[in-house]
């Protein structure tokens, strides 16, 4: 959760045209928030509400599009993406709840994210910030998200522009 908060803070600061955080470091979570968010003179109730709304959007995008460890059996876990969908049921009245469904069609995106996850420091995952920001803005289908992530990997992480891109988003 601290990483999710730090990625949310990066997105929020970017949207507000404020300076980015120096690095993603869970151990410096409180200091980072003090420096980049809580220490601002312009902080007010609306500002806080906007941050919470950004956090909600980031969390939804994270839950929907980003790999997690999934228990396959008692002694085996693997990376996977489970789609979220609303299901209703009538038992003496309507009940609505969210379910997660493991889809084979998401396997390619899960593999690509797994490569990105393991090829970078697992404490930073800088690819997540631009990916989450893009998902919030575009609200893509899974196919579009997969194509954009492939583009991110091929264009940014396979070239010299990675430092520039990560620095400014």
Residue positions per predicted region:
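Flexible coil/loop and intrinsically disordered segments
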Residues: 1-169
